[in-house]
Amino acid sequence: MGQNTLVFNLDTALKMMGDVAEFYVDNDVRNHYFVSISGYHIDEAGANPITQSALTLSNGLTYVELFKARGLDADKFLRNFSWFFSNGMDPEYAVIGRVSRRIWAIAMRDLYGVGERGQKLKYHIQSSGRSLHSQEFTWNDYRTTLQALYALADNANSLHTNSRDEAFGTPTEDTVRDAVAIQLILAKEYGWLRNENPLQGSFIAEFLTNEVEERVLRIFEEMHSRGGVLGALEVNYQRNRIQDEGMIYEHRKHTGETPIVGVNTFTDPESESVSADDFDIEVTRSDVTEKKMVIARNEKFKTENAKKAEEGIQKLKEAARRGENLFEVMMEIVEHCTVGQVTQALFESGGKFRRNM
């Protein structure tokens, strides 16, 4: 959705998601999430925090509808759900966790009769990659610190802090250590966070929570009028919304309407944007020999497993035709089949994604 990387026909893709959920429930798989419902890539592609929350939650609710329609017990498959959001600098990011948890808990309790555990929304926060800038790039650590503070004050279950040089390249060991130090200092030294829920009762936090929740629900209504998440996907609602909001952000950044210190305000006329070329960073690339080695290894694997692979692919196609659990079959055949072979078989039996124009 955000990365524009839909591959399979939607029906096929959702059927496979249901197959995975069914496999986990039937085999009582615990302590492992079969899906991390992600809003991070939606945010990075340009969406604002409200749209990030709305599209992510609506995806999760769609999964619940589909899995329940297959007869799966929500209390059993929801224990293997996790969530993933981005935190930027806007004030709404301070409450996307509590808003998402409130909407999710009410929906699970009142609409689906789910127990207490399934009402809980376990989420990971990563600081915003697109908020990092190559101008005055050392200041990115300050932005990341504030974003991490948002996450911890909003009771995120886990946190990833980006390195300051990710604005222009792969981070170095030193910048990664500094990014980890941000978390450690906030967790171990910053006294305010010793309070379990420091924003509780705050006027601005409560106001933002109610405001963001209302706007998320409005987006739900817009998608509902288009036939739900799947109907909205067919008419590019989500993708268009993400692109429009990304364009607005870039426009405001360039006009200075959205101030970014060191980039469009309080700039140093003698300071220039930096790139990876300005640093002694060893970039690892595959040379021709390594590429040929991987290709040869792949061909050798396919040759050695040709007969079993053919049988496995045929079994997968037959399972697809009969509507059986594809994930269960894939767990058997991946020892003898490549990802490419399995993907091609799924294309042939289920079709590719075709975007409406």
Region annotations inferred by a language model:
Residues 25, 167-170, 356-357:
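Catalytic or ion-translocation cores adjacent to nucleophile or general acid/base/metal-coordination motifs
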Residues 30, 71-77, 114-127, 135-167, ...:
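Flexible glycine/proline-rich, aromatic-decorated loop/lid segments
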Residues 1-87, 92-93, 111, 118-124, ...:
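Catalytic alpha/beta active-site cores
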